[in-house]
Design a protein with these regions (language model features):
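Solvent-exposed interaction patches of small proteins and small membrane subunits
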Residues: 1-117
């Protein structure tokens, strides 16, 4: 696979962010998540790192991995960074964590594997 120097680093940032989020919410209910502001802020910060890292991944890698919702992730970054004053829906964040991150983690593990061959 052809890639730009730095792609592997950014892919690793995505994977690390997902793993960190998973460690924060292990054995946590939605109610606990929504009421624990420190945990919520830590998860939001890692989602920002994840989204920011995907924006720095080269077009080559993005084209070779069209199943990843690159635009949606970029849009999430913009919401997390720019809409913080209006509040971010904890339910939406919880749904991303529970429904989207597991598959995203698999996809980025595959990208990492292909970049290290």
């Amino acid at each position: 696979m052809s890639f730009v120097k730095g792609d592997l680093l950014y892919v690793e940032h995505v994977i690390e962010s997902i793993q960190t989020i998973k460690s924060y919410i292990a054995d946590v209910t939605y109610d606990d998540f929504g009421s624990n502001h420190m945990m919520y802020d830590a998860v939001i910060r890692n989602l920002q790192i994840l989204a920011e890292s995907t924006q720095k991944i080269s077009a080559v890698v993005k084209i070779q991995n069209p199943k990843i919702p690159w635009r949606d992730i970029s849009g999430l970054r913009n919401i997390l960074v720019h809409d913080y004053l209006e509040g971010i829906d904890p339910n939406a964040v919880w749904n991303i964590i529970k429904n989207d991150l597991p598959e995203l983690q698999k996809q980025f593990a595959h990208i990492k594997l292909s970049l290290t061959k």
